């Protein structure tokens, strides 16, 4: 099957090309922290020769509790994103939750993300697609990999063929997630070769059934990421934090920023090895 390539300047995103790291922090906590985190990612990825896109949210609109930190909001968030681009020359991915956000966000960032909980909201999907920006679709935890083809079709029907698909885990009973490793290739197939990436951080969430925030399994981030990279993917989606225990969102799943270089080095080694193999057709 022919694999599609999406180009962002000098970055090529495709299942059969070197993986792209979509990395940053869960939510913009401050301008200074965003600068610190982005600088570290840029240093590490440049040293290792890994293509890089910065990620963060300006508004976590789906927090469990009304009292939880959501972010600085769109206006302030876009200012921070623009400063990161001007300072480090990075490409940026962020999510939108409302139709009115689509166009102004697409004018600043390079990839706009369709959140998993909103992935079947047709009006939002259409508004995002019509910006002409690259769209990253998070697979809903409740949706099978095979159903992702319908979301891709919605976007393409609006005249936008720049679609990335992202797996962030699948419901496993109540308050738990698992990753279906066979699902990555299903998504490649039903999307006719769209780039598929793996959000390892959010796949590690494990909720307290009566709590107001997600727990996580940070100690397993490297092992789960290794397994995903062995499939042969277009990219890895990762959140890191200088002090995960003090993060304002999803700290229990975040990689300590100090471990970033060792982590990315291992992912690159696996990606290089897997993509050096010749494909073996076992379908007949």
UniProtKB/Swiss-Prot annotation:
InterPro entries: Aldolase_TIM, DAHP1/KDSA, KDO8P_synthase. Keywords: Cytoplasm, Lipopolysaccharide biosynthesis, Transferase. It catalyses: D-arabinose 5-phosphate + phosphoenolpyruvate + H2O = 3-deoxy-alpha-D-manno-2-octulosonate-8-phosphate + phosphate. The keyword rRNA-binding does not apply. Its EC number is 2.5.1.55. It is found in: Cytoplasm. One of its GO terms (molecular function) is 3-deoxy-8-phosphooctulonate synthase activity. GO terms for cellular component: cytoplasm. GO terms for biological process: keto-3-deoxy-D-manno-octulosonic acid biosynthetic process. Pathway: Carbohydrate biosynthesis; 3-deoxy-D-manno-octulosonate biosynthesis; 3-deoxy-D-manno-octulosonate from D-ribulose 5-phosphate: step 2/3; Bacterial outer membrane biogenesis; lipopolysaccharide biosynthesis. Belongs to the KdsA family. HAMAP family: KDO8P_synth (MF_00056). This is 2-dehydro-3-deoxyphosphooctonate aldolase. It comes from Glaesserella parasuis serovar 5 (strain SH0165) (Haemophilus parasuis).
